[in-house]
């Protein structure tokens, strides 16, 4: 093993020199710095500067580092535990348990976090719909088992709540393995998630990996790869169907941009790293389904300043099968989940996949909502009286549809005081077909707000009439 010394520390970036005649570590190798007092710091090689000097990114705080400290090359990239031993546990970026439930046994298999994506001939595609129980998603932007799904939204529009509800609805009914990866998000949310999973009994089938907001950019940059490596092992070596939740994929990009300038790279658009598309591609191409097993990934994507043209969310869009867009204007109307029914997309909304009736109902719902959006300018200037009878009917139905696309979530019961609702796809399609047919035109609009099945609307209308 090569040994070297720390020669420069700039924030999370550490330069290390190896003497002449020693093997210079490869790119992505993990090096261990001895900080004394039994403490060590793991860093990852990013650049070879020449003359035996390498530039590395620290996976933890560089506080207390001094020039001249000894460094050992491990000879391998960061390796994390994989397999059954990871279930029910919480790990950091290095695969070290952080849940105070004891160390992982030394004989547990470990795997490098840097791997090639599966080869083209190993891939497989699926057309099986993944039922979420959330009306707006199942109807208008359905998810595919083994697909890649993005939840896009600005700050505070409900991405994490939606991902928690999807974990509640899918992971609890899914007998396979789940991997949850917290990338640069709030530690409090991670703690809440752990306890909720523990109470619901899902934890024993779940591996959790966290690199949260308070951690250095190195940890936030690599923690997504740690979680993905654990998911890949279940897929490739155990032939399992895996659910991979990532909250938030934007922080992966953000961490890369934080260290990019320190590594000496010239920034590109909006200050992002010039390697943005490459880094995103390397991560996303590994999240896929093969002939051995599937990985269904659900990724929250923060949209800076609600700007979808920002390079980070724009780069992510290209890799996804379905997108669920959360819209701030809908939260202001009190419609939760605040999913934009016209901007959300899915490659699975196809009559050959979802069936002819589902496809026709979904497209008619979108057409009605689009017509309502076009008429809103006329309504705001001239009022409803200027519309034709047909247009008035369209507007009234569109408003009922818009309210009926909301529903109470199980994970938000403590805030709302309303029991969460899970609505099967067949029920969702039938309900919206009946609304489009005018069966419920006489019921008040407010009866459609924040309910599950259409029968609850009828009950609510009766209660309101009393």
From Swiss-Prot:
User: What is the designated name of this protein?
Assistant: ATP synthase subunit beta
Q: Which PROSITE patterns match?
A: ATPASE_ALPHA_BETA
| Entry EC number(s) | 7.1.2.2
Q: CDD domains, per this entry?
A: ATP-synt_F1_beta_C, ATP-synt_F1_beta_N, F1-ATPase_beta_CD
Q: Which HAMAP family match?
A: ATP_synth_beta_bact
Residues the record lists as binding ATP? 153-160
Q: How does it sit in the membrane?
A: Peripheral membrane protein
SMART domains per UniProt: AAA (SM00382)
Q: Which UniProt keywords apply?
A: ATP synthesis, ATP-binding, Cell membrane, CF(1), Hydrogen ion transport, Ion transport, Membrane, Nucleotide-binding, Translocase, Transport
Q: Which InterPro entries match?
A: AAA+_ATPase (IPR003593), ATP-synt_VA_C (IPR055190), ATP_synth_F1_bsu (IPR005722), ATPase_a/bsu_AS (IPR020003), ATPase_alpha/beta_chains (IPR050053), ATPase_F1/V1/A1_a/bsu_N (IPR004100), ATPase_F1/V1/A1_a/bsu_N_sf (IPR036121), ATPase_F1/V1/A1_a/bsu_nucl-bd (IPR000194)
Q: Which domain of life is it from?
A: Bacteria
Q: Which family does it belong to?
A: Belongs to the ATPase alpha/beta chains family.
Which transformation does this protein catalyse, written as a reaction? ATP + H2O + 4 H(+)(in) = ADP + phosphate + 5 H(+)(out)
List, in alphabetical order, the Gene Ontology terms for molecular function in this entry: ATP binding; ATP hydrolysis activity; proton-transporting ATP synthase activity, rotational mechanism
Q: Which gene encodes it?
A: atpD
What is the species of this protein? Leuconostoc mesenteroides subsp. mesenteroides (strain ATCC 8293 / DSM 20343 / BCRC 11652 / CCM 1803 / JCM 6124 / NCDO 523 / NBRC 100496 / NCIMB 8023 / NCTC 12954 / NRRL B-1118 / 37Y)
Complex formation: F-type ATPases have 2 components, CF(1) - the catalytic core - and CF(0) - the membrane proton channel. CF(1) has five subunits: alpha(3), beta(3), gamma(1), delta(1), epsilon(1). CF(0) has three main subunits: a(1), b(2) and c(9-12). The alpha and beta chains form an alternating ring which encloses part of the gamma chain. CF(1) is attached to CF(0) by a central stalk formed by the gamma and epsilon chains, while a peripheral stalk is formed by the delta and b chains.
Any one GO CC term of the record: plasma membrane
EC class of this enzyme? Answer: translocase
The cellular location(s) given in this protein's UniProt record come to: Cell membrane
Specify one Pfam family: ATP-synt_ab_N
């Amino acid at each position: 093993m090569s040994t070297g010394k720390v020669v420069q520390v700039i924030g999370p970036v550490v330069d290390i020199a190896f003497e002449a005649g020693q093997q210079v570590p490869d790119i992505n190798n993990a090096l261990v710095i001895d900080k004394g007092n039994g403490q060590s710091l793991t860093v990852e090689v990013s650049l070879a500067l020449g003359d035996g000097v390498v530039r590395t990114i620290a996976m933890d705080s560089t506080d207390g580092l001094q020039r001249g400290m000894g460094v050992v090359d491990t000879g391998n990239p960061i390796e994390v535990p994989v397999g059954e031993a990871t279930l029910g546990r919480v790990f950091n970026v290095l695969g070290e348990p952080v849940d105070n439930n004891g160390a992982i046994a030394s004989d547990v298999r470990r795997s490098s976090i840097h791997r090639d994506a599966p080869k083209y001939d190993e891939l497989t595609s699926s057309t099986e719909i993944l039922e979420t129980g959330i009306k707006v998603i199942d109807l208008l932007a359905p998810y595919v088992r083994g697909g890649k799904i993005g939840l896009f939204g600005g700050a505070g529009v409900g991405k994490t709540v939606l991902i928690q509800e999807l974990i509640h609805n899918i992971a609890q009914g899914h007998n396979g393995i789940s991997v949850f990866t917290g990338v640069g998000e709030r530690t409090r949310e991670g703690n809440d998630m752990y306890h909720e999973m523990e109470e619901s009994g899902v934890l024993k089938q779940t591996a959790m990996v966290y690199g949260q907001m308070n951690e250095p950019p190195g940890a936030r940059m690599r923690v997504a790869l740690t979680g993905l490596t654990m998911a890949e092992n279940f897929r490739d070596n155990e032939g399992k169907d895996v659910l991979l939740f990532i909250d938030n994929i934007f922080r992966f990009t953000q961490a890369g941009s934080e260290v990019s300038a320190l590594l000496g790279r010239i920034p590109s658009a909006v200050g992002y790293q010039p390697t943005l598309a490459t880094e995103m591609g390397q991560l996303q191409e590994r999240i896929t389904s093969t002939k051995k097993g599937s990985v269904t990934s659900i990724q929250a994507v923060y949209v800076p300043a609600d700007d979808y043209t920002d390079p980070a969310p724009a780069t992510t869009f290209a890799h996804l099968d379905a997108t669920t867009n959360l819209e701030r204007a809908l939260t202001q109307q009190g419609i939760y989940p605040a999913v934009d029914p016209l901007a959300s997309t899915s490659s699975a909304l196809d009559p050959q996949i979802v069936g002819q009736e589902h496809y026709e109902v979904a497209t008619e719902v979108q057409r009605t909502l689009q017509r309502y959006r076009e008429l809103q300018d006329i309504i705001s200037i001239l009022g409803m009286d200027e519309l034709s009878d047909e247009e008035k009917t369209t507007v009234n139905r569109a408003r009922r549809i818009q309210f009926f696309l909301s529903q109470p979530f199980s994970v938000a019961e403590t805030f709302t005081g309303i029991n969460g609702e899970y609505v099967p796809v067949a029920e969702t399609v039938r309900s919206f077909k009946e609304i489009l047919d005018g069966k419920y035109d006489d019921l008040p609009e407010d009866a459609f707000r924040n309910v599950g099945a259409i029968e609850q609307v009828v009950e609510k209308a009766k209660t309101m009439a009393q």
